[in-house]
A protein has these predicted regions:
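Intrinsically disordered, low-complexity regulatory segments
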Residues: 1-162, 166, 466
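Conserved short loop/turn motifs at secondary-structure junctions
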Residues: 1-3, 101-104, 181-183, 254-263, ...
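Basic, low-complexity terminal or inter-domain segments flanking catalytic cores
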Residues: 2-3, 79, 90, 173, ...
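Amphipathic alpha-helical transducer elements in NTP-driven molecular machines
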Residues: 9-16, 33-36, 40, 76-87, ...
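C-terminal or mid-to-C-terminal helical accessory/interaction module adjacent to the motor/catalytic core
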Residues: 137-219, 254-258
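Phosphate-rich ligand and nucleic-acid binding surfaces
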Residues: 223, 253-254, 324
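Metal- or metallocofactor-binding catalytic centers and their adjacent structured scaffolds
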Residues: 232-265, 271
Length: 691
């Protein structure tokens, strides 16, 4: 009997169906000599600090740095039952071999190995490495299973990444949170991303616009522009000279240019385009793509490749033929598919580019939600564009001389629409306009030496423009390219984060209060500015990630030492703690809320502030919190107002009128007491004579 372990339940179900394991059990499928189960993502993770020492529950500078000598693991909250299922299956006497069917890549390897180690399993295991959930891909993968131990170096690379992130995250977060009296989440990827937002916002806010002038010359149906002029008097002089002179075309340059078809989508490119065209957040795009993948309509979405392999050319051309028949906007379009530009075995590591599946050709759009339809259309259109002919046009640059000054005008004329025809048709079908689209300007017939009498000149006043605020589209691009020049070509990961994690990083910055969305824009908050300002460059620069990826790539290849890498991380962490041992009193107040305290915490004496959903103690080490939706007040049909909270904190009691009695169905007036016993929840009780 073989036990197959997938990363997610939906993937496990798909594999079970292909293998004929059709008997549904609790947490797994069985049949045809197979048991098929799943991990529910990261089922096992590195244990938190308190697991090593109970005193670490309280954050104290004297305990830093926290460096485990014997790393421990823990089952993720809410996933204990599934781990128990896997452990029991691994130790079943009739199971002779295990197949690691988790996602093909560094993290997928880590997910399986953590479960394998935590279950103390010693049985041999093999590796399933596939990029599509189609039946044919699964069957082919099982006929070519790899030796699981041949991926040991990849696992060591993944393990080092996890431990290093734990060490830096735990210690840096505690260190700066202790110093500044506020929980400040610090991470190797999150912090440099925040810094990019801060730097861009600062560049915008500190930008000083400068006025300049441009003279437009209208001659023979052509509008040519002068160079930028900072002096208005010079512009007036140019205008006056031109209006008295004859204009002459002194130079006419025509150049045929070709724009190659676009590459296929990896996840980041798909997220960027979906944000630009539809306003989808990166997380929304990932969620929609994952749902389509689980429906077998889309190939694996968390890929960082924009290419396919040579053995996929025939099947991909069949896809293209099917799409031309399926998609209404392709009716009447003649497409001679050429996949040469997107076929490169060397640029496909874990997974190939995102593609529609053969299953999609059968199912179509009928069962899809609007958001899924939009995303699926983008993927289909990108494949068709990638296989189409290049876009060809003639670029024309004319120089017009007049009154001793020169003016330039540029235009272009399309010679062959190529892939742009498909892009335009797909955009029109979805009624979406690409704001970044380059408009076509066709110039009237011109010739060198051609003269124009009575030209008109006009001065326009313009201003220099500040940089644009980041959108998720442009931030994803910046994350993808950050530190690339310092990262080796063959590194598994480049830039900040991965195709799969960048969306989560953006969401974390927003939920932690360090950034916010304003329309499509991503803007840092005041706390975001302050956090970026107080942290050392080693934590705010992408360089750390670049250095790590260089080392982790070496470990995955077996050319670098995991022990040496971890030793360097421990030294860096210890150096941070030693360097930042104390700060001034003024700096310690950087993150103090601007609003007034509503009272004093009855447990620790710190200030209590009002939040959106609660009244909470400002000392993060104290667990005192009063929830606005507390059942005590809901049952009595009273709103837990700020005035009530103030009175309870000041006097320990408050008189409230018109409380509802669930026993009598009537209202009454009474005194509510703050009956705090120091536990997880704050209690209240009524003490009064009912009227």
């Amino acid at each position: 009997m073989k036990l197959v372990i997938a990363e997610k339940p939906s993937v496990g179900a798909a594999i079970a169906a292909v293998l004929g394991a059709n008997e549904k059990r609790s947490g797994y499928f069985e049949g045809s000599g197979y048991l098929v189960s799943w991990c529910i993502g990261h089922l096992i993770s590195l244990a938190d600090a308190a697991t090593y020492n109970e005193q670490y529950r309280k954050w104290k500078y004297d305990d830093l740095p926290i460096v485990p000598q014997d790393w421990q693991f823990t089952v993720a909250n809410g996933k204990e039952q599934q781990f128990s299922v896997l452990k029991d299956l691994m130790h079943r006497s009739d199971v002779s071999e295990i197949v690691n069917a988790c996602d093909s890549g560094r993290e997928g390897e880590l997910i399986f190995r953590f479960v394998y180690e935590q279950a103390n399993c010693q049985k041999p295991f093999s590796r399933l490495w596939i990029s599509s959930m189609e039946e044919s891909a699964i069957r082919e993968g099982f006929s070519n299973l790899k030796d699981g131990r041949s991926y040991d170096d990849l696992y060591q690379s993944a393990l080092c990444r996890a431990k290093a992130d734990w060490l830096v995250g735990i210690n840096a977060t505690r260190l700066f949170s202790i110093l500044y009296h506020k929980t400040l989440n610090v991470g190797r990827v999150q912090t440099p991303t925040l810094t990019m937002l801060v730097n861009r916002d600062y560049a915008i806010s500190s930008f000083k616009k400068e006025k300049y002038h441009v003279v437009r010359l209208d001659a023979g149906g052509v509008s040519a522009l002068s160079e930028r002029l900072n002096d208005e008097a010079a512009a007036q002089q140019m205008k006056a000279a031109c209006e008295k002179s004859q204009a002459v075309c002194t130079s006419l340059k025509k150049e045929k240019k070709t724009v190659a078809p676009p590459k296929l989508f990896d996840l980041t490119a798909l997220q960027r385009e979906a944000n630009r065209l539809y306003g989808f957040t990166a997380k929304q795009t990932l969620d929609y793509a994952q749902a389509l993948y689980e429906k077998r309509l889309l190939t694996y979405p968390r890929t960082d490749s924009k290419y396919i392999t040579s053995d996929m050319q025939d099947s991909t051309k069949e896809l293209i033929t099917g799409l031309c028949s399926l998609l209404p906007f392709m009716q009447g379009v003649k497409l001679q598919a050429d996949l040469t530009r997107v076929c490169d075995n060397s640029k496909v590591t874990d997974h190939h580019a995102i593609l529609p599946t053969a299953e999609f050709l059968k199912a179509g759009f009928s069962s899809l939600a609007d958001s899924e339809t939009k995303l699926m259309t983008l993927v289909c259109a990108k494949l068709l564009c990638a296989a189409a002919a290049p876009y060809e046009y003639e670029a024309v640059t004319a120089v017009i001389s007049c009154g001793g000054y020169t003016f330039t005008v540029k235009g272009k004329t399309t010679l062959c629409e190529g892939w742009r025809e498909i892009e335009k048709l797909s955009r029109a079908a979805s009624e979406e306009q690409d704001e970044d689209a380059d408009p076509e300007t066709v110039l009237p017939p011109l010739a060198e030496g051609q003269t124009f009498d009575n030209p008109a000149a006009e001065i326009s006043e313009r201003y220099t423009q500040p940089p644009k605020a980041y959108t998720e589209d442009t931030l994803l691009s910046a994350m993808e390219n950050a530190g690339k020049e310092e990262t080796p070509e063959d590194a598994e990961r480049k830039g900040l984060g991965t195709t799969a994690t960048r969306a989560g990083i953006i969401e974390k910055l927003i939920s932690a209060g360090f950034a916010e969305r304003k329309g499509k824009k991503l803007i840092p908050t005041k706390d975001g500015y302050n956090l970026a300002a107080i942290l050392p460059e080693v934590l705010t620069s992408p360089q750390l990630t670049a250095e790590w990826e260089t080392r982790l790539t070496g470990i995955a290849k077996g050319s670098d030492s995991p022990d040496d890498f971890m030793r360097s991380i421990e030294e860096m962490t210890a150096g941070l703690v030693k360097t930042y041992s104390a700060i001034s009193e003024d700096k310690a107040k950087l993150f103090t809320p601007q609003w007034e305290a509503i009272g004093t915490c009855p447990r620790c004496g710190a200030a209590v502030y009002e939040g959106k959903k609660n009244y909470y103690c400002s000392d993060r080490a104290c667990s005192f919190v009063m929830w606005k939706n507390d059942l005590f007040f809901q049952q009595r049909k009273k709103t837990f107002t700020k005035a009530i909270a103030v009175a309870l904190l000041k006097d320990g009691k408050v008189k409230i009128k018109g409380m509802y009695s669930t026993k009598t169905g009537k209202t009454f007036d009474g005194i509510v007491l703050l009956a705090d016993t120091g536990g997880k929840y704050v209690n209240f009780r009524v003490e009064q004579n009912r009227k």
